[in-house]
Amino acid sequence: MYTFVVRDENSSVYAEVSRLLLATGHWKRLRRDNPRFNLMLGERNRLPFGRLGHEPGLMQLVNYYRGADKLCRKASLVKLIKTSPELAESCTWFPESYVIYPTNLKTPVAPAQNGIHPPIHSSRTDEREFFLTSYNKKKEDGEGNVWIAKSSAGAKGEGILISSEATELLDFIDNQGQVHVIQKYLERPLLLEPGHRKFDIRSWVLVDHQYNIYLYREGVLRTASEPYHTDNFQDKTCHLTNHCIQKEYSKNYGKYEEGNEMFFEEFNQYLTSALNITLESSILLQIKHIIRSCLLSVEPAISTRHLPYQSFQLFGFDFMVDEDLKVWLIEVNGAPACAQKLYAELCQGIVDIAIASVFPPPDAEQQQQQPPPAAFIKL
């Protein structure tokens, strides 16, 4: 009998994983403070990593990688892409971005002496001078000059401003209490018809204890309810596809898709009929490349291969597609929620791939090693 503890009662994904484990009859749930467990389904931000792997004779597995915030916080992701040897020169799939600290945090400002591609040496270096250099050059060249400011730890569409005025963006950040990222706004996105609407794409990615990377075959488009336009960047419902913003502010929420969600099968049909292309050939190949590039760049820093405990983690990668069908990474979520209709399959995959590979069912010795569930693709 294996044992597990649950330290995050708010995760709907791990509530389902917990239910699936108990249903096998091979797992027993312990009190959250019991130190002698096989599996910890923990909270993302306060996991006691230092206490893991010290129980004699007990293999321990936890559902997060220590240090994964290098990918999952917006400012850290920008720094990673600019400083990682694997990404710095070859990354063409991430919008031009700058890390900006509010002036009240008294963070050193990096002088813009190396053009617009700053080498970030300090963990807290403000890049506003580099941003202004790039902004002014685009203005002189007559290029599109719309940017989006996003709180590094923000979620659900909070802490966001879209503007073509540099002073407005910087003033907005300076009145906040935390680091932000200023990122080039994708002004010509691929739009859905009917409705001339924006969308983004959420893909779920599972990394197991051996750092094998699995992409969940199903994904979801989170769609806007209102027609896209560039006349008013304060109109959240046409620019931001966050579920909570669409539901709260748009009278057309649910008009085109139930819950403003379109799944991959329907999206593939749309691409085939409207553009004579397939999802796999035009978009998914790019998504797979970006996911592998990101996760492999942080592997040396977060892998648990030589530690006394093991980790796995579910990630949510968010993408946008421009009118030229180029895929752009927007952000990575380290504790993603899941569309309701996908819970059962996604969570069963977590059990089969990430947990049963470390703690096999008692009858597994009589069975040959099973391939990953068909719902997941090993990258």
Swiss-Prot record:
Keywords: ATP-binding, Ligase, Magnesium, Nucleotide-binding, Potassium. It comes from the Eukaryota. It is an enzyme of class 6 (ligase). It catalyses: C-terminal L-alpha-aminoacyl-L-glutamyl-L-glutamyl-[tubulin] + L-tyrosine + ATP = C-terminal L-alpha-aminoacyl-L-glutamyl-L-glutamyl-L-tyrosyl-[tubulin] + ADP + phosphate + H(+). InterPro entries: TTL/TTLL_fam (IPR004344), Tubulin-tyrosine_ligase (IPR052492). One of its GO terms (molecular function) is ATP binding. Its EC number is 6.3.2.25. One of its GO terms (biological process) is microtubule cytoskeleton organization. The keyword Transcription does not apply. Residues 3-370 form the TTL domain. Its cofactor is Mg(2+); K(+). Pfam families: TTL. GO terms for cellular component: spindle microtubule. Catalyzes the post-translational addition of a tyrosine to the C-terminal end of detyrosinated alpha-tubulin. Monomer. Belongs to the tubulin--tyrosine ligase family. PANTHER family: TUBULIN--TYROSINE LIGASE. This is Tubulin--tyrosine ligase. It comes from Sus scrofa (Pig).
